Structure formats: structure tokens, C-alpha cells
Amino acid sequence: MDYYGKRVATASSDATIKIIGVNNNSGSQHLASLKGHKGPVWQVSWAHPKFGSILASCSYDGQVIIWKEGNQNEWLQAHIFNDHKSSVNSIAWAPHELGLCLACGSSDGNISVFTARADGGWDTTRIDQAHPVGVTSVSWAPAMAPGALVGSGLLDPVQKLASCGCDNTVKVWKLYNGTWKMDCFPALQMHNDWVRSVAWAPNLGLPKSTIASASQDGTVVIWTCAKEGEQWEGKVLNDFKTPVWSVSWSLTGNLLAVADGNNNVTLWKEAVDGQWQQVTVVEP
């Protein structure tokens, strides 16, 4: 879904991307088909509209393609990245405060971060062997520093990433002087099978940082860090008794959507006592 909720981009195993217009009154209409990948497309992601009408896609073919809309509903391949040697499983645009910046996680174990320059080129930084058996998901931390709302003075935007992979772990990374370094010791490990999805919650400037992770083992874990520099603590939200494919936060960070292997999407909320409770099941 784009920023304005007007268009949906879909990724398919037939190697195509479709742009669909969504209208409250007349339903949906097909606007464009984007062809460029040579294998299943795993994920698509819209950039913030301040950068124009831009879409990123990643595929089993190892490529990441940046698509740009020229004339209305005419999409061009603005850039193709061939940095990865195997399937690129996850892409995530950074908070817009950090510029036009895309993180990519691959089955080759590496994470690459591409940042657009003013001259139209791209700078690349890498996290080599972030998860040696394969990276399954990446998610950016909010740009607003934890505690910025309750602190004083101006703080620089935060450049942090969460990742997960086939080594059953979640890891947190921070950019120090142009180099990505692990920011959690040890790696966050409460799952006993592949971690399929990781999502960093919006924190609205509050001191606590929160990450959700979903695993093949059927559990979703909520990781919290009370304040910068402290250890992350994990709590199992629920055991779904079936692989969990995806977790996603609401814009305010107080609702978590969970998609599981039984084709259910459930919404969860933290109660006053710190326990997580199911709020509803999302009906298709």
C-alpha cells in the first residue's frame, strides 16, 4: 500500500509486479504490470512520496530493482542492484529522515544498504555474513532517537536495523562512522527454528525500544530494550502451534498484526500489566 492508501503493489511468483488502484467507491482497478525480474518476486516496498513515486522489489533471482513512475502508470527501471549471489528475501526503506535508503537481506547471508546520492548514483554499505545461513527479514528502527520526546536538545536521527535469519536469531545493527556493527550482545535468541519476520515498532520518541519476531517454531517474541545501551529482553507473545510468517506494527506501535500458517491474521495489544492480549481476528 502506498503512503496515501490509493495504490497497492503486489509481488508474485510469476515474476511480475502489479499496481492496483484502490477506490472506496468503485473497488479496485489494474493500473500497471512491471516486468523485469527473472524469478519469483518476494517483496515490494513503496518509498516515501517526498522522493517521488518510487517502488523497490526483490526476487529469487538475486536482483533488487528500483522502479520509478514517469508518466502516470508508466514505470521505468531506474536502477538494478546485482550485489547478492542468491535470493533477496527482504527489503525495507529507511525512515525518510535518513534519505532514500534501502536495506536488503539475502540468502547469501549478507545485508546490503543502498543510499541514493544527489548525482543519481547510489552508495553501498554491507553487513557481511549477518546471518551466515541466510537473512529472511530486515526492519529499520524509528529515526527518532529513543527518549527524544522526554529528553532535551536535538538528537541526530538513529541509523539502526534489525535482522533475522535461518540461524534462529534476531540481531540489531547500528551504523558507526560509515560501518555497520552489531549493537546487541549476544544475538537475540529465543526461537528454535528459522525466524521468518522481524518488525521494529514505532516508538514516538519514548525511551523503550520494541521489536517483534516471528518464527517457523510457531512463536512470536516481543523484544524490549528499556533504554539505549541496556540489554534486550524477550517475552513470548503467543505460541500459534503453526509457523508464523509475518509480523507488522500499527503506525503508533501499540497494535501488532500476526499472520500465521493457518491463514489467520490476528491483532494483539499490550495490556496495562505488560501482558499481550489478542484483540481481534482480521476477517478476509
Place the predicted regions along the sequence by residue.
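Loop/turn segments within WD40 beta-propeller blades
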Residues: M1-G5, S45-G52, A92-G99, S139-V158, ...
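WD40/WD-repeat beta-propeller blade-loop signature
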Residues: Y4, H30, P40, F51-I54, ...
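Conserved strand-to-loop turn within each blade of WD40 beta-propeller repeats
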Residues: A11-D14, S57-D61, C104-D108, A116, ...
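WD40-repeat beta-propellers
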Residues: I17-V22, V44, V64-E69, I91, ...
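Beta-strand initiation motifs
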Residues: N25-H30, N71-Q77, D119-T124, G178-C184, ...
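WD40/WD-repeat beta-propeller blade N-cap
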Residues: L34-V41, F81-V88, D128-V135, A141-P142, ...
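Solenoidal tandem-repeat scaffolds enriched in leucines and small polar residues
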Residues: A78-W173
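C-terminal interaction modules of eukaryotic adaptor/scaffold proteins
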Residues: A226-P284
